[in-house]
Swiss-Prot record:
This is ATP synthase subunit delta. GO terms for molecular function: proton-transporting ATP synthase activity, rotational mechanism. The lineage of its organism: Bacteria, Pseudomonadati, Campylobacterota, Epsilonproteobacteria, Campylobacterales. It is a peripheral membrane protein. It comes from Campylobacter fetus subsp. fetus (strain 82-40). Belongs to the ATPase delta chain family.
Length: 176
């Protein structure tokens, strides 16, 4: 539910921005969103003793050289008692920024390390396939195979060695 409301705020916010303001506001939202990782901030935001304007002004004070648009946006969110949506709004804004720039990031996970050349080749092939700039982060874990995830594009490709072994065994048993 929070994501749906966040999308509406982001859509309205984007319509009010020029291309120059877009990146700056994205960074400001990201900075405020990172502050939400602190438990004390949640206490301040949820406190009934602090006025909505004071909450918005406090969040605005966390930013250096912030734009007037972010201040007005924070005041609007505070007035509607939706300051708690800022992390979701930031995430959605980041996604919209990626769509605008045709630049997406994904994860490659598996129990082995890919070489830089292999990673670059995968990035180039996926970039060509989707017509966008794709960057991958390589994560080594216990997954016996390889899994490629592009959440923003809704793509997940996986190859499991265990599954391959099971299917080969099943095929051999059927053949006998």
């Amino acid at each position: 539910m929070k994501e749906v409301v966040a999308k509406k705020y982001v859509k309205a916010l984007i319509l009010s921005l020029s291309s120059d303001e877009f990146d700056k506001l994205g960074n400001e939202l990201k900075d405020i969103s990172n502050a939400f990782l602190l438990p004390k901030l949640k206490v301040i935001i949820d406190s009934p003793d602090i006025s909505s304007k004071q909450k918005a002004d406090f969040l605005f004070s966390l930013l250096d050289n912030a734009s007037n648009k972010i201040h007005n946006f924070l005041l609007l969110l505070a007035e509607r008692k939706r300051l708690g949506l800022i992390p979701e709004i930031s995430k959605e804004f980041e996604y919209q920024q990626a769509v605008r720039d045709c630049k997406f990031s994904g994860l490659i996970s598996g129990n082995f390390e890919l070489s830089a050349a292999q990673k670059t080749e995968l990035e180039e092939r996926f970039s060509k396939k989707f017509g966008a700039k794709i960057e991958f982060e390589n994560i080594k874990n216990n997954y016996n195979g390889i899994k490629i995830e592009l959440d923003d594009l809704g793509v997940e490709v996986s190859f499991s060695i265990d599954r391959l072994k099971a299917q080969m065994s099943e095929y051999i048993l059927k053949a006998i």
